[in-house]
Amino acid sequence: MNDMLFRTLLKRYEATIEDCMYKIQSLSENNIIIPEHVDITGEADKLLQTMAEAEDKVAVLRKYYVKNKAEAKIL
């Protein structure tokens, strides 16, 4: 995998994680209730699932596509 593709995917997954964290924080701190999403715990669960999938993808990228261990620590 070339470096640009690797970094693009990594940023994509990291952005997904940040987005989910922000949404969960907003749900819990601001008590936001969206009419279509009355099930707050269900929404939080879906967001956690999305985060877990993104973290798994980051782990796979690092495991199989990082060239050396020094580079893995930087990323």
Would you name each region that the model predicts?
Residues M1-L75:
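Extended, charge-rich alpha-helical interface modules
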